[in-house]
Amino acid sequence: MAKTNKQMIMSICNDINKKEGEGAVYSLGSKHADLKINRWSTGIEDLDAIIGGGMPEGRVIEIFGPEGSGKTTLLYHLASLQSMALDIPIEGTFDADRAKIFGNKPKQLLVYRAKFGEDAMNKTLRFAKAGIPLIGIDSVPSLIPKEDAEKVLKSSDKDSIEEQRIGGTARLLNKYLPMIEEIIEVTGTTLIFTNQVRDKIGAMMFGEKTDTPGGRRLKHSCSIRIQVARRAWIEIPNKNPHNTANSEKVGFIMKCKVVKSKVSNPMGECEIPCFFDRGFVSFDQVKPIRNELMKLRAQKYGKRIPKEDLEDEEESWEEEEDGR
């Protein structure tokens, strides 16, 4: 057994705290060990519940899922809750009208169109130092270093291009995330990445066949990773004479699963209804909103709505065939 010199250990602790500030080294049970995690509500009760009471300040969050699952939609919603937020849509797909639907306002939501991965990361550092409450990067696969982007343009090998993109993104995050984490821990900025699901390169017959771009660094840095999927469409009878579909999709049910959490118990799940014209709502609101939309469509197209449609007790939605 090692010979422990407690007096020397305490002397070292005191010296470190004197040079680096009180609390640089502390023991279990001290006031520094019991610091409360500052959080802000997502405005969605069920989502708050599965992430421990709200989004933590000064942490890295990842929202990932397949295309059309609502990643950007959720990011717009979360940005609208802040006094100021920065959206970095590297994919070039920023939708001002959709951002407004979720409550974002002029001068409250800033948008920076990054050309290359370094642009996005450097602006993230600058705005985080200024203490902006939220930064959203949409999305990880588009975080390509300038040098790698130029190589991709010159390459004709599809597999080589994909490997170049994935490797470049991982290297970029390895370089910048440690600096960003150190800054946001002090300023309280919440950094949210949206990410996609990709087939694993060289995946074996057994085990996970899919993964998310960004490498291990992003996964390690995240305090919360939320997997989202579109479980079902919310529909109403179609009254548009120019549309031959039987029903009109007016929203969807988003399924959220916490696959990693450093600030709460992981693996919690919830489902959230979202309407395209007004954003996220509770399940109690689904039926009244559907009835309202049916009446509006009937007035617009001069169609009568059968009474049984309005009195239907069951919300109408269509399950996704692939279970997403």
Sequence positions of predicted segments:
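C-terminal regions of RecA-like/P-loop NTPase motor modules
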Residues: 1-27, 231-324
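Conserved inter-motif catalytic segment of the P-loop NTP-binding fold
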Residues: 77-78, 82-175, 179, 297, ...
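Structural signal for conserved beta-strand scaffold positions within catalytic alpha/beta enzyme cores
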Residues: 27, 87, 111-113, 193, ...
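Helical mechanochemical/support elements of P-loop NTPase systems and associated helical scaffolds
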Residues: 5-8, 12, 39-46, 56-59, ...
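Conserved, well-folded catalytic cores of nucleic-acid-processing
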Residues: 15, 19-23, 50-54, 66, ...
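The Walker A/P-loop phosphate-binding site
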Residues: 2-109, 122-129, 296
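Phosphate-binding/switch region of NTP-binding enzymes
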Residues: 166-278
